[in-house]
C-alpha cells in the first residue's frame, strides 16, 4: 500500500513541478505545431481537461475580473476566463444525471453558444439516461440581462424533445449558434443512418427554436396542431454529422463529417440534404468535398469588427481538421490542422483552394477541435495535452516580423509529402497506390543501383551533356548525380528525378510535380527505405479485416479510452516494478 502512496505523491509532485515550470518549458509545445509564414502563436491560458469548444463574449467588460471567453470540457465542466486570464469554473457538471464513475462513459458536452443580450449561455450534450440509453439534451444558464458573470444565477434543461430518440457518441447533438432571437442546433444521425430522412425525429437535422426552447412558426415543417413534435423544430434535414456552424448575416454555413469524405456546405431552409447512409448520398449536395476525410470540426470567419488579420482575409473561412480518430503524429492528408480558403458569397462557391494555417507535427495523439476569432487574434483549442503534458488555449496572430521557429514551409513528414505530390496516384508505396508507374516498394535501391552505376548509363549521360538545346537545370541535376558513386549516386539520382523526371530521359511519361529540393530529399530518403513485404501485407490486411468485423467503428471515444488506459497501465507497471525492486 505504501508504494501506491509513494506513487500518488510522486505524480502529484510531478504535476506541481510541471505547472511551476510552465515558463521554463514554454518552447516545448512549439515543436508540436507548425505555422504558416507571417503568423505567430502564443499560449493564452492553460489547465484544462479535454477542452472541446471555445466561445467569446461579444462585448466583454473592461475590468480585469470581467469574463472574456468560455471553454467547454468534454466531460461536463464549463469554465470561464476573465480579462486577467484567470480561469474560473462556471459550472461543475452540466449533465442532468450522474454518470457512472466506475467506467469511462463516452458521452459529454459538445456545443456552446452565448447570448449576451439576455445573459444566456447554452450548452448541448449527450448523456446516459436512467436506463443506460444515450440521449441528447440542452442546458441554458441564466445571468443578468446584458451581463454574463463568472457563475450563473440559474439554469434550465431542455430534454423532452429528445427523450424518445437514441443518440450515439460522435453522432450526437452538436454545435449551436444564435441569430437575433433564434437558436440553431445541429443534431447527428445517432445510431440508425436512415433517421436523417425522417421528419418525426430531430436526428440528422438542423433544428431552430426561440431562446426559450419553443419552435418558431415559420419553420418549414411546422404544424399548428397544438402538439410539439420534431418536425416543428426542423429547419433542414438529411444531414449526417454537422460538427461546425457559422452564421454570416442570416446565412448558415456548416462543416460535416462523412464516412470517407467530409464537406463544407450552406444550409438552406427546408432543404433535404439526402443522407441515407452512403457517401454518395452525403456528397449529393455539397459546396466543397474533402477527400479523403480529414475530420472537419469547427469553423469561423473574421467578423467586420475584428481587424487583427489583413483585409485579404475578410472573405475567408477557417476550419479545424481533427483527423481520423485513433491517429497519432502528423496527419498524412492535411488533417490535424487548421485549414482556410476564400469564399465568393455572390457566386456561392470557393474562390481559392484550401491551404494550411497550422499543422500538428507532434508524435502523440492529438485532436484539434475548436477555433474562434476575437479582437486580438484567432483562438484555438486542441483537446489532448501537448508534449509538455499541458492543455492550452492558443492565440494565433498575424505578425510578419514573428520569430516562431516551426514553420509549415519546412515540411518534414514524408507521408505528408507523398500525399501533397500525389505520388500514390501512379505508384505503389508501402503497399498502397496505383499501378500506372513502377512499384516503389520492391527493393528500389537494389533495382536502381545496378542501372545507375553501369557503364551504359554513364555513356548515356555523356551523350545528353553534349546536347546544346538541353535545359540548364537538367545539366545541373545530371552533374549532381554523376559526381557520386554507389548508393550515393542512387540517392542523388532519385532526388533529381523527383524534381525533374525528364532530367536524364526526355521520353519519360511522368509529369513534373514541381517539388523543391528539400521535399525531394525527404521523399527520396523515405522511398529508399521501403521494403518488399507484399505477402506479409496481404496477411496483415486479412487479419485486420477479420478483426474489424468484431470491433466498433473507431471514434473519438476510443482515443480517449486508449489514452486513459495507457495511463492506468503505466501506473500498474510502475507499482509492480517498485514492488519487485523492494523484494
Model-derived regions, located:
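Selective detector of the "anchor" transmembrane alpha-helix that sits immediately C-terminal
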Residues: 552-579
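Beta-propeller domain segments
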Residues: 20-35, 63-67, 72-75, 102, ...
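Extracytoplasmic electron-transfer domains, predominantly the class I c-type cytochrome c fold
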Residues: 109, 430, 434-528
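C-terminal capping alpha-helices of c-type cytochrome domains
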Residues: 377-379, 384, 398-402, 490-503, ...
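Asp-box/WD-like beta-propeller blade repeats and closely related beta-sheet repeat scaffolds
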Residues: 134-177
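Beta-strand-rich domains and repeat architectures in extracellular enzymes and scaffolds
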Residues: 43-76
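Blade-loop segments of beta-propeller domains
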Residues: 86-118
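Sequence/structural segment immediately N-terminal to covalent heme-attachment motifs in c-type
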Residues: 45, 409-429
